[in-house]
Amino acid sequence: MKILDADAWMAALMAAPRPGADKILAFYDARVDAVCRDARCLLLPLDDHMCHRGDALFESLCYREGRIFALEEHLARLRDGSRALSLLPPCSWDELRARILDVARASGTDHGDIRVLVGRGPGGFGVSPEECPQSSLYIVALRKALPTEAFYEKGLTAFASAIPPKQEYLARIKSTNYLPNVFMAAEARQRGMDVAVTFDEDGHLGEAAIANVGIVDAEGRLCCPEGRRILPGTSMLAARKIAPQRLPVVERPIRREEIFTAREMLLFTSASLCVGISHFEGRPIGQGPDAGRPGPVARGLRDALLEHMLATGTPF
């Protein structure tokens, strides 16, 4: 086995295959305190507790037409997680916000996704945060194709996951410890469906792997699960804010059997805003001739959310 010096190592590393490089537009690394556009340089120290312990926070943002959606809401949730984990970023919150805008500008495109990751930092392979003298910060701008009209018109298929909801003390922290979510994504692939959805021990609706879900119930109300064992996403919260102009909104436990009598089932994400779920466990959602197709609330909320987020998004 060869033993390389630093120059030879870096040359070999830069020449090695880099899957996913085409998706990375620009990134910031607090260790260097600069932005780079070469995906080969996007590297994480293996002894950062983010890597081997999941001791880190992250946020997924999207930007459209040169505006970052819900930036302040994402930062507020990151601060909440920071308090819960006693994990501060290696800069001030104002500086972190400015770095996000810097990376968005450096992406060279007016639409894409952004990931913000705050880790415990490098320092060892133990579990105690005390061995990490400085936290880490990475901000990455990603290439992201906009959802097509065909995607929205077709809708999504969903099913009840075998994975239980996260425990209450973990559910509201957006950490990088995402193994249950990975299991849910694997379930969906194995079953040939789009979305796995959790249910608690009492049969109440939880969330999808990387999205919130809700229903338009038989009475025509937008119903969202209680926030006790889910992570309320920025798109769902925005939908609850603007939806009362269209229909009543309630937050309450949603029983699994209600899905089969619901008018619509909805999925909320930062990237696609609001998408109708057309089938659950192989059965069409909705009643009458329009059953099994995304309904008017899904379409209306998607348009309203896009309008709201473009109007309130942070320009860069």
What does each model-identified segment do?
Residues 104-108:
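Phosphate/pyrophosphate-binding loops at sites that engage ATP/ADP/AMP, CoA/4′-phosphopantetheine
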Residues 109-113, 193-194:
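Short secondary-structure junction motifs
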Residues 92-101, 111-126:
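Short, glycine/charge-rich beta-strand/loop segments that flank catalytic centers
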Residues 1-90, 98-102, 128-316:
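Helix-start/capping segments and mature chain N-termini
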